[in-house]
Amino acid sequence: MNFQENYDVIVIGGGHAGVEASLAAARMGSKTLLMTINLNMVAFMPCNPSIGGSAKGIVVREIDALGGEMGRNIDKTYIQMKMLNTGKGPAVRALRAQADKDEYAASMKNTVSDQENLTLRQGMVEELILDDEKQKVIGVRTSTGTQYGAKAVIITTGTALRGEIIIGELKYSSGPNNSLSSIGLADNLREIGFEIGRFKTGTPPRVLASSIDYDKTEIQPGDEAPNHFSFMSSDEDYLKDQIPCWLTYTTENSHTILRDNLHRAPLFSGIVKGVGPRYCPSIEDKITRFADKPRHQLFLEPEGRNTEEVYIGGLSTSMPEDVQFDLVKSIPGLENAKMMRPGYAIEYDVVMPHQLRPTLETKLISGLFTAGQTNGTSGYEEAAGQGLVAGINAALKIQGKPEFILKRSEAYIGVMIDDLVTKGTLEPYRLLTSRAEYRLILRHDNADRRLTEIGRQVGLVSDAQWEHYQAKMAQFDREMKRLNSEKLKPLPDTQEKLGKLGFGPIKDALTGAEFLKRPEVNYDEVIDFIGQAPEVIDRTVIELIETEITYEGYIKKAMDQVDKMHRLEAKRIPKNMDWDKLDSIATEARQKFKKINPETLGQASRISGVNPADISILMVYLEGK
């Protein structure tokens, strides 16, 4: 085969999955090529101008802990930062940043361009080149006929695979934001034999900032107290000059406009055939599914410091443009708003994810990986997490090293990938805290404690990040030791001080840690009694200490459950398993096992339609092997 150039890893698509995949592979020493349709759209945000949010924000922290880039990049380019769910328990707290979308993309492109071992190139890949047995990928062919050799290929094409934009009755071939649609590669994947699904997502109109009457909306400022996505970011660099978002609502008039035009809605007229996201429905879908609700929240989100475009969060629509004009003007604060871009729906092909291994390598073709919306997920963060895992595993495969699989108990990224490859998805998959059975362990504050050592082992965490992490953990250990040794004694002045703070008297001496276990007590109050540490304790260390001590009992119970699951995960299933030999299992279970081909007993137990009796039979069979 005559190749123009040869690479270890080729990544197809420069979105959020593609940049993480290519950076990970290159940083692990693989000669990497990132091919993208348009160099001006590297790490572009075609929909919401934000990073993070419920569950997603924890994913960004996990990416950072493993040595990925998304957290660092948003910490350099945000215009607002806000911690969500602060009134709830630590398991569901998550950070969200409003991004300057142009700055975010430009900064990430610079990072990719400057990365050693990584080549960034514009081009459209139309075909995967396979070996003579059609079992292994050995390269790619572009629309110009140029061929590049590769030991591994990662497809991260987002919504571009046979993408079609829909606005009212208008439907045309396009990727996101009027970029080119990737039709040749979509055809090629079908020809190779992959099962392809068709999904849909959408985006709202953008309006001119200076045409908004903000007096009719509610201001939504960022947090004054510092927070960051990257564990390497400093509180000293926290942005003080933040830009607010604004809250408004749909009205009964808005709903009337939509109801009167539902016959023209592509979602209901049959023009849209792809399956849309359950947790991010269009406004026309909302007023139909939730007809009893008199109004729906809308967030006016600035897209950056140097643009007048404002994103109307919550108003995703593919209604005809004339309907969108009327709809926007029916919203308080937007009566005189000038629409800059109409909302649209986009349909695209997806590789149904049950065809993937937990490494995100395809079962059908060796050396071929897929990540991001190509796998049926929604969201920049979900895409980036998958891209990181695919990039790591592509590099490890080439190096002949053990594969990298995150457990459900280790990361939200592990939960997501296990859900995709074990259960599959029939609609755009979104991460939710409710999907994680061990969410008290998978918190915002402990992502580095969970994953930095793992990232170091695979060769992705830098020396600087590793030293920073070790210093933090050493301080954590020292202060935990102090809290478990220093005591509050039942002396008169202690009892008086407790009374003034609203606490009852103590009968016996308590360690600082025992006192902190009380749900109404915080770290600063403990310090009032036992004194300051001989060093300045980092804010993030204090946060970790408070959670670990206050929820110690619950965390221990969760860890006991994790140990039970790990015993199931340790029981491997042979790759060439003959499922027909299991005569006693239910027919549905046998069919699911054949389709998914689970790799461990634990994975088999999580397949929908498989009951405990089937797992018991499988366990007996494996123990007899």
UniProtKB/Swiss-Prot annotation:
It is found in: Cytoplasm. The keyword NAD applies. Its main location: cytoplasm. It comes from the Bacteria. Its cofactor is FAD. One of its GO terms (biological process) is tRNA methylation. It holds the Pfam family GIDA_C_1st. Keywords: Cytoplasm, FAD, Flavoprotein, NAD, tRNA processing. GO terms for molecular function: flavin adenine dinucleotide binding. The keyword Cytoplasm applies. NCBIfam families: mnmG_gidA. Belongs to the MnmG family. Homodimer. Heterotetramer of two MnmE and two MnmG subunits. NAD-binding protein involved in the addition of a carboxymethylaminomethyl (cmnm) group at the wobble position (U34) of certain tRNAs, forming tRNA-cmnm(5)s(2)U34. This is tRNA uridine 5-carboxymethylaminomethyl modification enzyme MnmG.
